[in-house]
Amino acid sequence: MQEMQARAQALISESALRSNLTALARQAGTQLLLPVKADAYGHGMEIVARLAARHPAVWGFAVAVPREAATLAALGLGKPILLLTPPTLEEMGPLADLGVRLPVASLAEAEALPAHARAHLKVDTGMNRLGARPEEAVRVGQRLAERGLLEGAYTHFATADEPDLSFARQQFARFQEVLAALPPVLAHAANGGGVLSFGPLPSLSLARPGLASYGFAPAHLRGVAPLTPVMTLQARVTHVHAVYPGESVSYGGLWRATRKTIVATVGIGYADGYPRNATGKACVLVRGECRPVLGRICMDQCMVDVTDLEVRVGDWVEVWGTDKITVTDVAAWGGTVEYEVLTGLGARVERVAAG
């Protein structure tokens, strides 16, 4: 059977990824534990991991769920993998067999770990999501050390991407108190906001910049390190036709032509992760020009005004990229954040490694 063409492609730039990793490692003063959870923030876990594994600053990878860990381990990239959220007791053995580092936050978990496991102590310093409170974390960490299983310890900053860093500093002080009561371990706390806000932090061996690795920073931290969006999203024109005065486009008739308009139907919609809430605000790049999306964004398609442009079926239009239209723009149009737009990118969008 002939291979079918993708209607939409996410081009993943190796050069942008490498540049971002270099800049963040320099800013942090440590190696990186690169988060590739949620399909590498929508960029494609396998593509990103294969590209990043060749970078000298990447110590290993962090994932959110056991299935991600198993998939990543099967690639055989030779880099450590840390599971960030707790597995069930039944999952501990198989994950340890794969060499996956396991999070531990209780004495019960510390006792249940198989003898060949490697553990990272999860400390809750104020996020109140996962982990042991500092006083309990010390006891858990000491027990893991007694068993010879303690490789690392980590916490997570709740507000490091905000201008006010006072709470993040409190969190880090609590984490340092825990580290002082343990033998030397691989310690990590700084997410992207932490890396950009604080730079090198004492006692830390690794940094975990997530969204920043893919080229995005909070508005007040842009420019601290040179970051470039790694993904360019493009979609094919599937139909070109004329619409005449008084005629409407898409569901609900929200947009109505006041003049003859040439409309291109483009093969991407909200089922692919293009936010429906961006209706009435979104535009795409057609031959380098920002052109408005007309009417409601549909499940599989959207319609674009291409009047006075030379456009044919099969042409690519840029949905977002590095210059005129970014994920930040699309997130603003959709009333959300870059994380949600990127991780919502659907499986129908083909991920392609690019230069």
Curated annotation (Swiss-Prot):
It is an enzyme of class 5 (isomerase). It catalyses: L-alanine = D-alanine. One of its GO terms (biological process) is D-alanine biosynthetic process. Substrate binds at R129, M299. One of its GO terms (cellular component) is cytosol. The modification N6-(pyridoxal phosphate)lysine is found at K37. Catalyzes the interconversion of L-alanine and D-alanine. May also act on other amino acids. This is Alanine racemase.
